[in-house]
């Protein structure tokens, strides 16, 4: 059986997805690398490294080499990409793969080139850079070649990409540095300010998933969480409600809604009419926040 040599990569701030031609999504793991500074060696990548966040000794850093959709550490990103490419290809990787890789629509040419170069260095034979909204539209089953307006809102781990696409091109777009990671930081700040308790990223993410929302819930939920009292330094347990968390997220979720409105205002009338008829396609991990679709409506 021939080796799979065409793969697609969604290189996100929070996670990385790898698609292999003819096989579908073959890998989904956190974009995290555990790096040993003393030994100058990568200790873990992906889910194993994510489990180390906040739990490593001083010589080991659990880092995200991507921030807000762009590379912040080229060498670590290259090593991470190489690892995931080899893992996705398996033993059948007799040839270097052709890789399509996504970038936010608002990246600069320098940032775009950095992603391309890191992908080549990681072992690609050919590299095709695809704007994230275009990839999201294709993945949603839309025929982007038709003369019809489609609005894509991709709330990723580092940025929110908003675009109106028609005839295989981006007519209007905007990329804002607000994301599902911003939701986590909102929760961390709220708990610290309100309860004098510090919680980690993983706890904040769990709160977001279980009781977080962008729109009022029919039934209020509560969740018990554990952290560290910032005054005494001792372990602390508190209970937060879904109403509290919605309030903590309100500024960020409203900024996303405002950014969508700003793109619509710049959209040609005919395409805006198409969007009104066809609706908005929400993608990305942040779009899974409960009530996000209702808020945008």
Predicted features along the sequence, with ranges:
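Nucleotide/phosphate-binding catalytic cleft detector across ATP-hydrolyzing
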Residues: 1-155, 163-280, 287-297
